[in-house]
Amino acid sequence: MKVIGITGGVGSGKTALLEYIRIHYNCEIILADEAAHHVEEPGQECYEELVELLTPAILNEDGTINKKRMAEEIFADDSLLETVNGIIHPAVRQYILSEIELQRSLQQIDFLFIEAALLIECGYLDIVDEMWYIYAAEEIRRKRLKEARNYSDEKIDAIMQSQLSEDEYRKACHFVIDNSGELENSFEQIDRKVREYL
């Protein structure tokens, strides 16, 4: 089983490419955002620490963390973002390591893909066999984020500034998929790469 990290800036199109991979290959996909939501739930390892740090004002009526409210608060404050990441990322990493161990023991899949914007910053280079960078030109990413997620320029700026630069991604990754154009073109790049392992 090959463990492959999938990373790239916000709006680069990681979700669409992972959906293609999920359908066409014998694999499991771990989304770090979903793992993060899991560890933030009431009763899970990060919940109490986050509520203590960000105050109960970030909670919904049912006691769950309001993700939108939390994101607005932390992306506006670099030191707060760093503190929150320091709480969530170790728990997510442990969750992912457990999943890798489980899939290795089951021996049922060819690939385990791990997707996250912050794989490199969080030290995942040492637990994946390869890191893939999903690239898309900044103007295309901005257009996608405005159309698909209705993000403002300010919100896009804040998120992009908190992520690695294109150059940093390229230096750290083993393989680059250019997802600036048609999806079919990106799918072909994936197929060519995956064929090297099958």
Predicted feature locations:
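Hydrophobic anchor at the beta1->P-loop junction of P-loop NTPases
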Residues: I6
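ATP-dependent small-molecule kinase phosphotransfer cores
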Residues: H37-Q108
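ATP-binding Walker
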Residues: S12
